[in-house]
């Protein structure tokens, strides 16, 4: 995979080309100090939170300073969130212009593994603090930053705010991932492959044809690479929306395919794919066991996972000692 292929898939590169067929979005350059804040692995202190004009009696029981037991320990550190006033104003103006609620992401990835930490268990954000909370809690975004010890200086990181669209329950069955090799679709996969949707099996021919037609009319030969992956959403009116573009390779989820078969299955002389109008369409059928969400493992802190799997022996030993001490104390009582 070439570096150009990855760069061509960043949001600001493809969005202007396909803006007509995508969700309305705003792109804001990410200042260096904001990037440093997101990369900081220290204690999570969320910045960008609007100051409350006062303590609400309805929501909280206000307590006077004399009633609070403050620590006199000189070693107690006070964690203060950094502020980014200019950036905060730009973000809030963008959020307001998009209707007050947005879906945030960076150049390539979104914090989809961190939805569980939000109060609404959603990626829906209405303030900068909502965005920071998701970004600081996401392993997916850190992976992008940490994948290369010497990041390309030409890469300008950007905050992408996409207008929030409420999807009806079960609307995930309308999302599909398309794999393109040599400017021809070789495979289409159900995006949410962990669930079975009866609608897909009933409409598979129509879905197959509409995606192929949309690709030929609007995407084919218009994307700078000939090998790539793109995600689409087909709404209830039949209109197709471009959601994202990704590199053709292991950095992108292959869903119901494997990258091995995607790479070797396409051959200009291959009988199965001899005609362009015959990409392989895979979806979860009723005979396949429904699989758990791939993001469930991100709901637990890594320490808990290490304990449960025994991957960190020192943590496990400390835990057993703590448990034994607790039992000894209970027996003494």
Spans of features found by a protein language model:
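Preference for protein termini
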Residues: 1-333
């Amino acid at each position: 995979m070439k570096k150009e292929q990855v760069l061509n898939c960043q949001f600001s590169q493809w969005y202007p080309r396909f803006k007509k067929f995508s969700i309305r979005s705003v792109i804001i350059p990410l200042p260096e100090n904001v990037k440093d804040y997101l990369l900081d692995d220290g204690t999570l202190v969320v910045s960008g939170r609007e100051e409350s004009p006062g303590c609400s009696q309805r929501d909280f029981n206000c307590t006077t300073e004399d009633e609070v037991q403050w620590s006199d320990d000189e070693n107690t550190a006070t964690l203060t969130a950094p502020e980014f006033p200019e950036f905060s104003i730009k973000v809030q103006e963008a959020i307001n212009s998009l209707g007050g609620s947005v879906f945030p992401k960076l150049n390539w990835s979104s914090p989809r593994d961190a939805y569980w930490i939000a109060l609404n268990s959603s990626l829906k954000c209405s303030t900068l603090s909502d965005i920071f909370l998701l970004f600081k809690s996401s392993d997916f975004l850190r992976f992008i930053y940490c994948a290369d010890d010497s990041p390309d200086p030409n890469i300008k990181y950007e905050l992408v705010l996409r207008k929030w669209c409420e999807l009806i329950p079960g609307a995930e069955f309308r999302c599909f991932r398309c794999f393109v090799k040599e400017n021809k679709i070789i495979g289409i996969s159900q995006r949410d492959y962990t669930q079975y949707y009866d609608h897909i099996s009933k409409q598979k021919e129509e879905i197959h044809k509409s995606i192929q037609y949309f690709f030929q009319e609007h995407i084919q030969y218009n994307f700078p690479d000939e090998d790539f992956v793109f995600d689409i959403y087909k709404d209830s009116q039949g209109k197709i929306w471009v959601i994202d573009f990704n590199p053709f390779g292991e950095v992108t989820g292959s869903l119901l395919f494997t990258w091995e078969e995607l790479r070797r299955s396409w051959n200009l002389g291959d009988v199965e794919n001899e005609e362009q109008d015959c990409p392989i369409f895979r979806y979860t059928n009723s005979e396949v066991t429904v699989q758990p969400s791939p993001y469930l493992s991100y709901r637990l802190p890594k320490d808990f996972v290490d304990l449960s799997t025994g991957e960190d022996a020192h943590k496990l030993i400390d835990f057993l000692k703590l448990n034994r001490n607790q039992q000894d104390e209970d027996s003494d009582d």
